[in-house]
């Protein structure tokens, strides 16, 4: 059975204690905090994790126009600084992985003034700088492929894997988000196998972006492949409302009852799938 967590940024303005209480009640192992070091208090996070018997294995980076790793100059340096501050926060709460989206979420058209090769060069340079700092503290960066309707850069597992290979850093790997993969990958298990040597983390949501089991994603085949490749990391739930801009989820008033339902649905479905796979061995 995998360690199962839930990412925190999706619950909008909900008090952190409400989120932690829900996770304990539903049987979760951990919480994935947003990488927002200026908004979250590490001591409060630690106290709540202790109170509700949770841990934190990862942070979810939030990458907007002000945190653009494909940029050069001051803008690129600002993105690196954001990641370094996130590393410091991760160290305080015990997280060993930070999820990194190389380009701003919401920008779906390539900047006209730069070629794709220049954008890649900027991303490689900036991520490598951040990775040097993170790795010195035992923290890894996991690059995430985001679907083409949310960003123009590194949309597939092949592209994000190639970027990680080009960065060529021991502290840089990739993560797999099954929602984005349901849009971009022809075969989810095959894509997981392809990135097996660099796979650090997994996000779980159905093809509708709701909780696992509410759409048509074949989670059994994905989990079977994760077992086959020896994946030992977390499965972290990242379900949300059906929104055109995913980051707007962090700005809305949370419907606590719906989040309660999603959280229980997600973990119950994934645990049931895991048990079925074990029984079939």
Regions found by a protein language model. Give the residues of each.
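Conserved, mostly hydrophobic/aromatic
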Residues: 23, 31, 49, 79, ...
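Histidine-acidic metal/acid-base catalytic patches
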Residues: 1-4, 10-24, 94-95, 158-172, ...
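Acidic-and-aromatic substrate-binding clefts and catalytic sites of carbohydrate-active enzymes
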Residues: 11-15, 32-44, 67-69, 106-108, ...
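Structural motif corresponding to the early beta-alpha repeats
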Residues: 29, 35-124, 232, 236-246, ...
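Catalytic-core regions built around general acid/base machinery
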Residues: 44-53, 126-134, 191, 221-226
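Active-site acidic/histidine proton-transfer and metal-coordination neighborhood
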Residues: 74-173, 257-260, 268
């Amino acid at each position: 059975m995998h360690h199962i967590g839930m990412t925190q940024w999706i619950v909008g303005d909900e008090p952190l204690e409400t989120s932690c209480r829900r996770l304990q009640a539903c049987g979760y192992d951990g919480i994935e905090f947003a990488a927002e070091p200026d908004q979250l208090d590490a001591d409060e996070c630690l106290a709540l994790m202790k109170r509700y018997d949770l841990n934190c294995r990862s942070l979810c980076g939030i990458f907007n126009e002000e945190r653009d790793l494909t940029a050069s100059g001051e803008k690129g340096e600002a993105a690196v600084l954001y990641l370094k501050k996130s590393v410091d926060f991760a160290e305080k709460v015990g997280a060993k992985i930070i999820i990194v989206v190389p380009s701003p979420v919401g920008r779906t058209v390539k900047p006209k003034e730069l070629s794709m090769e220049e954008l890649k060069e900027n991303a490689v340079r900036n991520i490598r700088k951040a990775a040097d700092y993170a790795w010195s503290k035992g923290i890894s960066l996991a690059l995430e492929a985001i679907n083409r309707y949310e960003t123009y850069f590194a949309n597939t597992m092949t592209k994000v894997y190639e970027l990680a290979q080009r960065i060529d850093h021991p502290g840089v790997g990739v993560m797999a988000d099954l929602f984005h993969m349901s849009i971009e990958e022809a075969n989810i298990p095959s894509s997981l196998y392809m990135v097996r040597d660099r796979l650090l983390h997994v996000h779980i949501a159905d093809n509708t972006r709701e909780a696992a089991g509410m759409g048509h994603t074949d989670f059994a085949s994905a989990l079977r492949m994760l077992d086959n490749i020896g994946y030992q990391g977390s499965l972290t739930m990242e379900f949300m409302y059906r929104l055109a801009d995913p980051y707007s989820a962090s700005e809305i008033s949370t419907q606590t009852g719906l989040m309660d339902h999603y959280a229980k649905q997600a973990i119950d479905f994934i645990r049931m799938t895991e048990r079925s796979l074990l029984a079939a061995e």
